[in-house]
């Protein structure tokens, strides 16, 4: 929100300096982003009129002007502005004036004397327009100091508003906050009804229910089409970042900036029949003020006449019904539209308007009739005309009602930790425009209709803290015993997990917790998905149920940008629900995804691509840090490559997945390389058993190697489990050191060779002991897995 300092001071008379005012605004939550002084150094700049302008004898683009500066004799000025012409009134910097870094001196330009400089608005620091001389009204008093004529010095102040403070999208809304902070009062404002002179009206039909519950309209006939915007209004608009256009348009903009009510002016003679508000119909077309013709769907609110849409409600007027410099009869609109009915509609069409921005945030539902009276008075004062009666069509049961809240003294003290005097509480709330009545244990407070962000007791307490001053809240240290949680040896913390993965050359990624529903459909992960009620965009419409879809998408973006070796991991929350309407459950997961070369390019190792076993090694290193013993079983997850993926188990419970992403899925994601990934629930992974010191055996270990022919369906995990169960405590380790299929092995079978390492803590094992163990192992494997010893 940008506004003129002098305009604000006209609504709230305060003695604070410009710097103090800016500091106060920031302190009460209206953060000042920029203060631009205007006209502080225009002491020798006056209003002047060009009497004659002739071409410079030595330069085609220069003119020699005779200028009346109110000094009795004409001054000769050489000027290069394209709009310099006889009769033009413009600012003149006299000899000796300081314009920015330039001191004006008498000089000769191409041999012709020049005694001053005719100025553009940019040269004077009043505007960004440098296309020509700053054109002043024809009736501007020649010889008067420009600063005096324009009401300078002034400043343009720009503040940053939080979404809840839509009431401060107006000078008067800001004035209430400043008055409360400076112990002042907001000046009285004349919004009295203007008596109608004619009986001309347009009927108003409300056909959008709660989306458009109020619409005020007024006909004004016989205005002067030659009337122009007065300099005081044009300057206030310009200093608020709005370029003056024409009187009727400028009046609607002026009322919006002053009161916060967007308005629109229609050329009455272009409207056919009653005015209505309704939802658009799919396929309807409308030519907008910016010259574009748009095709609407059924989500827009439209203003209509008897047979067509004539404006997009709350966004932009139509081209066919706009006011022009020939308009004599006008229909003024001032309405309240529900924010939800306007929100997002402008973005659909690539529109961003000041009116739309205000309606999206919320406009005072009681302001429409006042605004139309203020606008009427301005039209009559500046352009004449005969006003008809105001038509105020409303659906009262759909209009928001101000909240009435009990504010308790004890609650103020508990929330803020300080006591605020009763008199200060009443003064602050009253200055903010609230109706305050004393109650037994506090106050009954009714918020003004413009403050729809005030809904509960804590909202009022926030207002008190904001205006009373956060800097007046004493700094106190928290009391009570400090309970600092000590790291537990039975838990591997998240930082350690991150460090372990970083040590394995993985880089951490942080993705949105929201994903595209279409992406989850590709992964076939749509069960238990939690949709968002108000997503940031269609691509971020659901909460992620797993980390892998987002992580692999990030890997794909890196691959698309010619990153050959990608190694990423993420640790974050995932969300799922048992069914529609059930509360979502969140949990922590850790996931990794890799592709490209297994090792960074070097001269000492041959290049090879990363595979399942490389990432499995990274996973086992992570598991070793927590002492977890993981088991792997073939997986049937639809997003995994058949035969190259496994479910991960700990203590018999499935806690994750590892494998190659299915090639079809990778191709649909525009990834043309093999992607290896894993994903784990964090909680079962990080459980860590307390380390126990074991006795080192003084006796030697013995090894026996065995090779079995086993059916293809038998996994090494099943085989090794049988060995461990059979041997018992004598088994130190069982290792798979060879797998063979081919000549000498019948189809449907494979040869697995294992090494058994045996050791006893109390004695040296004999060959007889070892042979007995081997015999038991052979018998168990042959019995349980239909295997046979390979000769």
Curated annotation (Swiss-Prot):
- Pfam families, from UniProt? B3_4, B5, FDX-ACB, tRNA_bind, tRNA_synthFbeta
Output the InterPro entries linked to this UniProt entry.
aa-tRNA-synth_II/BPL/LPL (IPR045864), B3/B4_tRNA-bd (IPR005146), DNA-bd_dom_put_sf (IPR009061), Fdx_antiC-bd (IPR005121), Fdx_antiC-bd_sf (IPR036690), NA-bd_OB-fold (IPR012340), Phe-tRNA-ligase_IIc_bsu (IPR045060), Phe-tRNA-ligase_IIc_bsu_bact (IPR004532)
The protein's required cofactors: Mg(2+)
Q: Name one GO biological process term.
A: phenylalanyl-tRNA aminoacylation
One Gene Ontology term, aspect cellular component: phenylalanine-tRNA ligase complex
Q: Kindly state which keywords UniProt assigns to this record, in alphabetical order.
A: Aminoacyl-tRNA synthetase, ATP-binding, Cytoplasm, Ligase, Magnesium, Metal-binding, Nucleotide-binding, Protein biosynthesis, RNA-binding, tRNA-binding
> Which domain of life does this protein belong to?
Bacteria
The record lists Mg(2+) as bound by: 453, 459, 462-463
Give one GO molecular function term: ATP binding
EC?
6.1.1.20
Domain B5 positions: 400-475
The UniProt note on the cofactor reads as follows: Binds 2 magnesium ions per tetramer.
The enzyme's main class, written as a single word, is ligase
- Every copy of the tRNA-binding domain together lies at 39-147
Listed under catalytic activity are: tRNA(Phe) + L-phenylalanine + ATP = L-phenylalanyl-tRNA(Phe) + AMP + diphosphate + H(+)
| First-listed, main subcellular location of the protein, grouped into a coarse class | cytoplasm
Compartments (UniProt record)? Cytoplasm
Residue intervals of the FDX-ACB domain: 697-790
Q: How does it assemble?
A: Tetramer of two alpha and two beta subunits.
Q: Which family does it belong to?
A: Belongs to the phenylalanyl-tRNA synthetase beta subunit family. Type 1 subfamily.
- Cross-referenced HAMAP family, in alphabetical order? Phe_tRNA_synth_beta1 (MF_00283)
Question: PANTHER family given for it?
Answer: PHENYLALANINE--TRNA LIGASE BETA SUBUNIT, PHENYLALANYL-TRNA SYNTHETASE BETA CHAIN AND LEUCINE-RICH REPEAT-CONTAINING PROTEIN 47
Kindly provide the name given to this protein in its UniProt entry: Phenylalanine--tRNA ligase beta subunit
Q: Which organism is it from?
A: Xanthomonas campestris pv. campestris (strain ATCC 33913 / DSM 3586 / NCPPB 528 / LMG 568 / P 25)
């Amino acid at each position: 929100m940008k506004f003129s300092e002098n305009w604000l001071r006209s609504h709230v008379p305060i003695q604070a300096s410009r710097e103090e005012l800016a500091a106060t605004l920031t302190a009460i939550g209206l953060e000042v982003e920029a203060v631009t002084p205007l006209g502080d150094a225009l002491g020798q700049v006056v209003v002047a009129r060009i009497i004659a302008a002739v071409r410079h004898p030595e330069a085609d683009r220069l003119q020699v002007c005779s200028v009346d500066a109110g000094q009795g004799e004409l001054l000769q000025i050489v000027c290069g502005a394209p709009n310099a012409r006889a009769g033009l009134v413009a600012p003149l910097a006299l000899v000796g004036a300081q314009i920015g870094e330039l001191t004006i001196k008498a000089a000769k330009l191409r041999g012709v004397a020049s005694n001053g400089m005719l100025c553009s608005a940019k040269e004077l620091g009043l505007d960004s327009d440098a296309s020509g001389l700053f054109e002043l009204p024809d009736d501007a008093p020649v010889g008067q100091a420009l600063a005096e004529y324009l009401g300078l010095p002034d400043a343009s102040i720009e503040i940053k508003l939080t979404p809840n403070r839509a009431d401060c999208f107006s000078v008067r809304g800001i004035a209430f906050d400043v008055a409360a902070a400076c112990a002042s009062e907001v000046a009285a404002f004349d919004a009295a009804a203007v008596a109608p002179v004619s009986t001309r009206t347009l009927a108003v039909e409300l056909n959008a229910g709660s989306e458009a519950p109020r619409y005020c309209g007024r006909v004004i006939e016989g205005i002067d089409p030659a009337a122009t915007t007065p300099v005081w209004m044009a300057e206030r608009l310009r200093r608020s970042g709005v370029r003056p256009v024409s009187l009727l348009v400028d009046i609607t903009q002026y009322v919006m900036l002053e009161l916060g009510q967007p308005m629109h002016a229609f050329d009455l003679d272009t409207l056919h029949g009653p005015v209505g508000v309704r939802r658009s119909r799919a396929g309807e077309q409308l030519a907008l003020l910016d010259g574009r013709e748009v095709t609407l769907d059924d989500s827009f609110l439209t203003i209509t006449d008897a047979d067509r849409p004539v404006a997009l409600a709350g966004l932009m007027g139509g081209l066919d019904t706009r006011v022009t410099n020939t308009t004599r009869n006008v229909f003024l609109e001032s309405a309240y539209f529900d924010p939800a009915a306007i929100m997002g509609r402008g973005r659909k069409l690539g529109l961003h308007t000041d009116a739309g921005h205000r309606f999206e945030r919320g406009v005072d539902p009681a302001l429409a009739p006042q605004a139309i009276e203020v606008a009427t008075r301005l039209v009559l004062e500046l352009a004449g005309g005969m006003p008809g009666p105001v038509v105020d069509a409303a659906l009262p049961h759909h209009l928001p009602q101000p909240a009435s809240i009990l504010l308790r003294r004890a609650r103020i003290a508990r929330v803020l930790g300080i006591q605020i005097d009763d008199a200060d509480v009443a003064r602050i709330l009253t200055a903010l425009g609230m109706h305050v009545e004393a109650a037994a244990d506090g106050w009954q407070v009714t918020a003004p209709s413009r403050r729809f962000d005030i809904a509960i007791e804590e909202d009022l307490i926030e207002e008190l803290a904001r205006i009373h001053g956060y800097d007046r809240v004493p700094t106190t240290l928290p009391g009570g015993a400090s309970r600092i949680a000590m790291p537990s040896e039975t838990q591997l913390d998240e930082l350690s997990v991150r460090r372990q993965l970083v040590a394995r050359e993985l880089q951490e990624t942080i993705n949105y917790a929201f994903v595209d529903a279409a992406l989850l459909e590709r992964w076939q992960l749509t069960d238990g998905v939690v949709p968002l009620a108000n997503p940031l965009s269609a691509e971020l419409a659901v909460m992620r149920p797993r980390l892998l879809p987002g992580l692999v998408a990030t890997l794909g973006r890196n691959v698309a940008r010619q990153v050959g070796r990608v190694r990423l991991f993420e640790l974050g929350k995932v969300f799922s629900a048992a069914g529609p309407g059930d509360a979502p459950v969140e949990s922590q997961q850790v996931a990794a995804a890799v592709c490209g070369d297994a090792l960074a390019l070097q001269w000492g190792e041959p290049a090879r691509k990363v595979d399942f076993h490389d990432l499995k090694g990274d996973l086992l290193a992570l598991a070793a840090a927590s002492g977890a013993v993981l088991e792997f079983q073939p997986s049937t997850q639809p997003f995994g490559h058949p035969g190259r993926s496994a479910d991960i188990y700990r203590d018999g419970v499935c806690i994750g997945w590892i494998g190659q992403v299915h090639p079809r899925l990778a191709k649909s994601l525009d990834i043309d390389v093999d992607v290896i990934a894993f994903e784990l629930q964090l909680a079962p992974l990080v459980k860590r058993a307390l380390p126990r010191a074991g006795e080192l055996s003084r006796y030697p270990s013995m090894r026996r190697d065995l090779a079995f022919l086993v059916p293809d369906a038998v996994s090494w995990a099943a085989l090794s489990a049988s060995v461990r169960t059979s041997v018992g405590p004598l088994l130190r380790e069982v290792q798979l050191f060879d797998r063979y299929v081919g000549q000498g092995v019948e189809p449907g079978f494979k040869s697995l060779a294992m090494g058994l390492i045996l050791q006893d803590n109390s004695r040296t094992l004999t060959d007889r002991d070892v042979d007995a163990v081997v015999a038991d192992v052979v018998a168990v494997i042959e019995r349980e897995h239909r295997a046979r010893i390979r000769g």
